[in-house]
A protein has these predicted regions:
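Catalytic cores of the polymerase beta-like nucleotidyltransferase superfamily
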Residues: 1-198
Length: 198
């Protein structure tokens, strides 16, 4: 097997592909520890240098290397973290969450198409509200859906106990409820409906 150890230019997401010589080095360049495990064949040796199995069992997202280096290499990984919160119900480990907040502006070098793909996957997941909340809390939303964080500043004149953001999240949840009936899902998550709710 050929192992990779890419080198990134800080102003671009496109790596200069280089080949490494160890499986551990290859795994260190993965997005999160839960994706940095391997099975060495034919011996069937489980390789988990970053305790990804433990993080998977706990539902925790952490980067195999320093999160700042990981997100500097590929800023889309920050969006992927938010998607995993929504899709898998994971939580983001504190150091990783702090790096996302500090580096959210790095999304500017990622193509709109790649961001769109992650956003759509997040919105079509089982817990899009959790994903939207993670987008807002991390600061990523200001680069992806800038209208959404501003809703926290607005108070609904009729329901003063909740801000417009909370009402919007309730509308999103109601829209999702419309996707099901007594027979189950009808027929699948509806991206247009969920976007309209936002």
């Amino acid at each position: 097997t050929t192992y990779r150890s890419d080198v990134y230019n800080p102003d671009s997401r496109k790596p200069e592909v280089q080949y490494g010589d160890t499986l551990e080095g290859d795994l260190s360049r993965r997005d999160f520890t839960v994706n940095a495990m391997a099975l060495r064949v034919p011996d069937m040796e489980f390789v988990d240098p970053f305790a990804g199995a433990n993080d998977l069992a706990k539902g925790v997202l952490r980067t195999p290397v320093d999160p700042r280096q990981s997100f500097d290499d590929d800023p889309l990984r920050m969006m992927r973290a938010v998607r995993f919160v929504a899709q898998l119900g994971f939580t983001i480990e504190a150091r990783t969450a702090e790096a996302i907040s500090d580096m959210s502006s790095r999304l500017n070098i990622v193509s709109a198409e790649r961001i769109r793909d992650e956003l759509q996957k997040m919105l079509l997941s089982e817990r899009p509200r959790k994903g939207v909340e993670a987008l807002v809390d991390s600061g990523l939303a200001q680069y992806v859906l800038p209208e959404i964080p501003a809703l926290r500043l607005e108070i609904d004149e009729h329901h003063r106990h909740k801000d417009v953001f909370e009402h919007t999240m309730m509308v999103l949840e109601r829209a999702i409820a419309l996707e099901t009936d007594e027979n189950g899902a009808v027929p699948a998550p509806d991206l247009t409906l969920r976007l309209a709710a936002l």
